[in-house]
Amino acid sequence: MSLLKMEYNLYAELKKMTCGQPLSLFNEDGDFVEVEPGSSFKFLIPKGFYASPSVKTSLVFETLTTTDNKITSINPTNAPKLYPLQRKVVSEVVSNMRKMIESKRPLYITLHLACGFGKTITTCYLMATHGRKTVICVPNKMLIHQWKTQVEAVGLEHKISIDGVSSLLKELKTQSPDVLIVVSRHLTNDAFCKYINKHYDLFILDESHTYNLMNNTAVTRFLAYYPPMMCYFLTATPRPSNRIYCNSIINIAKLSDLKKTIYAVDSFFEPYSTDNIRHMIKRLDGPSNKYHIYTEKLLSVDEPRNQLILNTLVEEFKSGTINRILVITKLREHMVFFYKRLLDFFGSEVVFIGDAQNRRTPDMVKSIKELNRFIFVSTLFYSGTGLDIPSLDSLFICSAVINNMQIEQLLGRVCRETELLDRTVYVFPSTSIKEIKYMIGNFVQRIISLSVDKLGFKQKSYRKHQESDPTSVCTTSSREERVLNRIFNSQNR
């Protein structure tokens, strides 16, 4: 730990990483506060900040020669086979770490690798290469399985803990496995933090973008007060301010053969309203809609739009154009709505729900990986990051209000490399609720723009559904005809 006065150059360097957002750190009294320029307080500067050679410092950091927490179960013959780009990442990491050791810098590296790159297997290779006892920290238990699979493939002795940290501490008194796979809430326990700081050298923070380290969280406190000897942040969408805690980044672009298409399924709707909708519209401009809660609630009860989504999905799935579908909503009630309606169409052998409130959901996710055809309905919170179903070939985004980081993570669910190359995303920019019409259009356009500009998708207009089902409740032509007749009649009165 380094308690330092906030001199101008140090403040400027730290503030630059927050991209204009408030800079918050622990002060000498242990309070997590916003740092003001010229402050007389001393602040705890994160160890990982000094990982970059561009940060000037006279501080000298420990190297791996000062510890003896080595893996005992390692077998070099079990090292996973890597693709050329993955081997390039390993080479870059090893080269950077040599330089860090020579200059006595902290061994902290952010692996900024695209969704579908294979961060888990690459990191397991690095873990085996280092041969140091490791803690793998995940934001939720849904990510445990993919780590368990890869750690077992490498042949490392491991322990998984997702529930009580107290019972884990008791077990650690008699055995100390080479690899601990835990959920991040374990870091709220100071005794556990002290234990892993002493007995484990490598700390892997998976999906690091899910943590805002400018907030006083368990992960923030751990990295500040119990900094590990070595640390990897893994992410496809780095959070800029988190660089203060891990200030060395390796980013290798991944070329892909995937054929990625995003369809904007547009339609003309007559205005739709109910008492419930009118009640929620009144809240759109109030403080209760600060995070667009009511915007998404309105979408969840937009019957014509929901019907368009269902019609499109049912027709595409029946035609065999798409086979392994992820349907994403923002709200749980919206998820349940689509699940029930799709269940009526296709039955429980095809339609599954990714419900955070169901403890059996992770087991269900494992089981559907082997299916050739399925529809998985879930929420952005539960399945938007880290969902491990590599075979997904299509994504229906039913919500609209999604930030750029969430968009990139969500689209990454269908960008995993498999033998099948076609990937399709469907977005729905239209709404029958006129008060949010332009807002929804703008939000959905942001999804389209990011997918095209950054992730290599090609945008195409979607007309198949409207042309193939002229009797549908969502048909464009019939609605346009009625409105045009109405306008014509009004002009000739």
Curated annotation (Swiss-Prot):
It is an enzyme of class 3 (hydrolase). Keywords: ATP-binding, DNA-binding, Helicase, Hydrolase, Late protein, Nucleotide-binding, Transcription, Virion. Its EC number is 3.6.4.-. SUPFAM superfamilies: P-loop containing nucleoside triphosphate hydrolases. It is found in: Virion. A motif (DESH box) lies at residues 206-209. DNA helicase which seems to act as a postreplicative transcription termination factor. Involved in ATP-dependent release of nascent RNA. Forms a stable complex with single-stranded DNA, and to a lesser extent RNA. This is Transcript termination protein A18. Gene3D superfamilies: P-loop containing nucleotide triphosphate hydrolases (3.40.50.300). InterPro entries: Helicase/UvrB_N (IPR006935), Helicase_ATP-bd (IPR014001), Helicase_Restrict-Modif_Enz (IPR050742), P-loop_NTPase (IPR027417). Belongs to the helicase family. Poxviruses subfamily. Residues 100-256 form the Helicase ATP-binding domain. Disulfide bonds: none annotated. Interacts with G2. Might be part of a transcription complex composed at least of G2, A18, and H5. GO terms for molecular function: ATP binding; DNA binding; helicase activity; hydrolase activity. Pfam families: ResIII.
